[in-house]
């Protein structure tokens, strides 16, 4: 199969499974796409899309988990934190490629906020707001963080 076609197919499948909330499957397809991209001159916007989707999938991976008790709770939160740090890595890679995309800064700021890394969250969310002043959700999250004293 043509490697460009294979890259795009894996990104598309990753997006479909992300939208269906099948985040683990989405991550698997996006991992394949990003592995293929290492040796190809891929369109930067498609590459950004792959990193952004993988970051979102990692953030939401364990969101719907039920029946957490006792020791499982600690493991759950450790896994969640790791997912958020991995998502931050993906958003950072995407920002390196396209530093003018306000949504990438928003998602990375949102991940930092979830980890209570408020200075980093505020920094990214302010950049997102500067890039797109009409993105009101950014303002809402900034107000929420500032109400906590940051």
Residue ranges of predicted features:
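Alpha-helical tetratricopeptide repeat
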Residues: 1-150
């Amino acid at each position: 199969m043509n490697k460009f076609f294979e890259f795009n197919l894996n990104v598309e499948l990753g997006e479909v499974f992300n939208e269906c909330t099948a985040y683990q499957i989405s991550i698997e397809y996006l991992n394949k796409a990003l592995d293929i991209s290492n040796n190809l001159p891929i369109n930067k916007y498609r590459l950004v899309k792959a990193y952004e989707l993988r970051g979102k999938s990692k953030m939401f991976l364990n969101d719907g988990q039920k029946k957490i008790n006792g020791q499982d709770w600690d493991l759950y939160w450790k896994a969640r934190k790791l997912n958020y740090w991995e998502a931050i890595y993906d958003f950072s890679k995407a920002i390196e490629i396209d530093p003018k995309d306000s949504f990438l800064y928003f998602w990375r700021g949102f991940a930092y906020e979830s980890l209570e890394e408020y200075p980093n969250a505020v920094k990214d969310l302010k950049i997102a707001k500067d890039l797109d002043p009409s993105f009101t959700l950014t303002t809402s999250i900034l107000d929420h963080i500032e109400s906590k004293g940051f």
